[in-house]
Swiss-Prot record:
PANTHER family: GLUTAMYL-TRNA GLN AMIDOTRANSFERASE SUBUNIT B MITOCHONDRIAL AND PROKARYOTIC PET112-RELATED (PTHR11659), GLUTAMYL-TRNA(GLN) AMIDOTRANSFERASE SUBUNIT B, MITOCHONDRIAL (PTHR11659:SF0). The lineage of its organism: Bacteria, Pseudomonadati, Chlorobiota, Chlorobiia, Chlorobiales. Allows the formation of correctly charged Asn-tRNA(Asn) or Gln-tRNA(Gln) through the transamidation of misacylated Asp-tRNA(Asn) or Glu-tRNA(Gln) in organisms which lack either or both of asparaginyl-tRNA or glutaminyl-tRNA synthetases. The reaction takes place in the presence of glutamine and ATP through an activated phospho-Asp-tRNA(Asn) or phospho-Glu-tRNA(Gln). It holds the Pfam family GatB_N. Keywords: ATP-binding, Ligase, Nucleotide-binding, Protein biosynthesis. This is Aspartyl/glutamyl-tRNA(Asn/Gln) amidotransferase subunit B. It catalyses: L-glutamyl-tRNA(Gln) + L-glutamine + ATP + H2O = L-glutaminyl-tRNA(Gln) + L-glutamate + ADP + phosphate + H(+); L-aspartyl-tRNA(Asn) + L-glutamine + ATP + H2O = L-asparaginyl-tRNA(Asn) + L-glutamate + ADP + phosphate + 2 H(+). GO terms for molecular function: asparaginyl-tRNA synthase (glutamine-hydrolyzing) activity; ATP binding; glutaminyl-tRNA synthase (glutamine-hydrolyzing) activity. Heterotrimer of A, B and C subunits. GO terms for biological process: glutaminyl-tRNAGln biosynthesis via transamidation; translation.
Length: 475
């Protein structure tokens, strides 16, 4: 029997607010354990939560970006369960009335675009963290308690592990473009749980699902789903029954292992939080937030192709990260040439970032400086070869390209008389090659060009060199 994979994803996106969701404690990652805490975080008697307005606005931004309907009235609820790192004994979340409903994402995992529907996006607070690797004891760090999250729940529309990771990458791209999260999976800013099941091909009814946790990279999401699908297939083909449970992905062993029985919604005994008023989103807030939305990757890539005349592939790569797209546009603004700017950013800049393990935001060559370098190439002041030398020197100081060219004496030589003198010397020093060229070995033209450029240390204007050589060789 042939089976079809069915996957739905629950993604927790940690918001980059300065303070937590329901108190004024810092939400900064990496602080000493239990230093970002207050009576609200610890659920001490009499401590009352107050919702962070920025959390609501970020939820609305993501909802609008994913085509959701925004609820004018939504309710915060208590999700009740016991866990050592949850001091309150409940988590503030949303249940029956979430803030965003019925959206979608378009993804392309290599087989054309596909629509993945979203059930909901809702506001939630994070729990604390259990630490098991200090001696034989377990410690609790509650710094993360109350850090704001958005949970994005998809319909089970995903049919391959690649689709799942592509969906997750697309979602990460959107939250980063919106500026609401850094989307860092390794630090837990973006966490993904996958609900996996199999069903016979052609069946409409879903099979029994298992939930997979602890996947901290796109590659691990793919591997975990593929492993779990094969585990299900093996059980079903042997006539067994799938147990509905939560399983942990072990990246070292490349397998999932049972964690606990899968809970149902009624196990959490949701009810509206009596300490928090309903969340209201009016038309004025929606109008304001719509105006604040950025130009998203697909639209920006299309504009790059049309406005700057660059290839579709280049535009897609340049718009993967908002910061890279911003950098490119700032370069073009100074350089005035979209195609050459694209070549430099896609080539020298990205190569340097990869070699030095840098992010574009930490790159030492500001876009205005790179734009200035490209202008020098366009004006004929320097050659492409010299420009690459200047680019390397620009990474070592704050000097402009023009200042470096003047300081190092790298200006391009276009003086016909000087170039003619060098060409005459090269031809005189290589009589055999000259004779060979005149006998029809035209590929030797490149040899003469190389000799001239080497003699003039790369500073000769290639166009003038070619013209002079052509004239001398044919004379």
């Amino acid at each position: 029997m042939k089976y079809e994979l069915v996957v739905g994803l629950e993604v927790h996106c940690q918001l980059n607010t300065a303070s937590k969701a329901f108190c004024s404690c810092s939400a900064q990652f990496g602080k000493p354990a239990n230093s970002n805490v207050c009576p609200v975080c610890l659920a001490l008697p009499g401590a009352l939560p107050v919702l962070n307005r920025r959390v609501v606005e970020d939820a609305v931004k993501l909802g609008l970006a994913t085509g959701c309907a925004i609820a004018p009235h939504s309710v915060l609820a208590r999700k009740n369960y016991f866990y050592p790192d949850l001091p309150k004994g409940y988590q503030i979340s949303q249940f029956e009335e979430p803030i965003c409903i019925e959206g979608h994402l378009m993804v392309d995992a290599g087989e054309g675009e596909k629509l993945i529907r979203l059930i909901r996006i809702h506001i939630e607070e994070d729990a604390g963290k259990s630490i098991h690797d200090i001696g034989d004891d377990t410690y609790i760090d509650v710094n993360r308690c109350g850090v704001p999250l958005l949970e994005i729940v998809s319909y089970p529309d995903i049919r391959t592990a690649k689709e799942a990771s592509t969906y997750l990458q697309k979602l990460r791209q959107i939250v980063k473009y919106l500026g609401i999260s850094d989307g860092n999976m390794e630090e837990g800013s973006l966490r993904c749980d996958a609900n996996v099941s199999l069903r016979p091909v052609g069946d409409e009814e879903y099979g029994t699902r298992t939930e997979i946790k602890n996947m901290n990279s796109f590659k691990n999401v793919e591997k975990a789903i593929e492993f779990e699908a094969e585990r299900h297939r093996g059980i079903l083909e042997e006539g067994g029954t799938i147990v509905q449970e939560t399983r942990l992905w072990d990246a070292d062993k490349g397998e999932t292992r049972s964690m606990r029985g899968k809970e149902f919604a009624h196990d959490y005994r949701y009810f509206p939080d009596p300490d928090l008023v309903p969340v209201l989103v009016d038309d004025e807030m929606l109008r304001r937030i719509r105006l604040e939305l950025p130009e998203f990757p697909e639209a920006r890539a299309s504009r790059f192709v049309e406005q700057y005349g660059i290839p579709v592939y280049d535009a897609a790569v340049l718009t993967v990260e908002r910061e890279m797209a911003d950098y490119f546009e700032a370069v073009v603004e100074v350089a005035g040439d979209g195609k050459v700017s694209s070549n430099w950013v896609m080539g020298e800049v990205m190569r340097t970032l990869k070699e030095k393990y840098l992010d574009i935001t930490a790159f030492s060559v500001a876009p205005s400086r790179l734009g200035g370098l490209i202008k020098l190439i366009g004006s004929g002041a320097i050659s492409n070869t010299i420009a690459k030398q200047v680019f390397e020197l620009m990474q070592q100081s704050e000097a402009s390209a023009e200042e470096i060219v003047q300081r190092e004496g790298l200006a391009q030589v276009s003086d016909t008389g000087e170039i003619e003198r060098v060409v005459d010397e090269i031809l005189a020093a290589n009589p055999d090659q000259l004779a060979g060229y005149r006998e029809g070995k035209v590929k030797l033209f490149g040899f003469f060009v190389g000799q001239c450029m080497a003699r003039m240390k790369g500073k000769a204007n290639p166009k003038v060199v070619n013209e002079v050589l052509q004239r001398k060789l044919e004379g």
